[in-house]
């Protein structure tokens, strides 16, 4: 991928929800909720603190994370859908 977020932004590849329930019912696209978890595929360098030093991000490429339902901006690069958001929009890392 040739996308590098700036400052405290990260790029996340959403992990799609199951298309079928445990009982075998197929869920149409219109009824699916927006995924709220994904894998980080790119991170910015960090933000400048009051002293002019760059404070690096805590998250790193490969982390699986939970984020807010309406967080970020959806983009598409080379056919791949990504969500770009600030690191602070992430709730936490999934182990």
UniProtKB/Swiss-Prot annotation:
GO cellular component: cytoplasm
PROSITE patterns documented for this protein: CHAPERONINS_CPN10
GO terms of molecular function: ATP binding; metal ion binding; protein folding chaperone; protein-folding chaperone binding; unfolded protein binding
InterPro entries xref list: Chaperonin_GroES, Chaperonin_GroES_sf, Chaprnonin_Cpn10_CS, GroES-like_sf
CDD domains for this protein: cpn10 (cd00320)
PANTHER family: 10 KDA HEAT SHOCK PROTEIN, CO-CHAPERONIN GROES
Functional note: Together with the chaperonin GroEL, plays an essential role in assisting protein folding. The GroEL-GroES system forms a nano-cage that allows encapsulation of the non-native substrate proteins and provides a physical environment optimized to promote and accelerate protein folding. GroES binds to the apical surface of the GroEL ring, thereby capping the opening of the GroEL channel.
Summary of subunit composition and partner proteins: Heptamer of 7 subunits arranged in a ring. Interacts with the chaperonin GroEL.
Record protein name field: Co-chaperonin GroES
Organism: Rickettsia prowazekii (strain Madrid E)
Gene this protein is translated from: groES
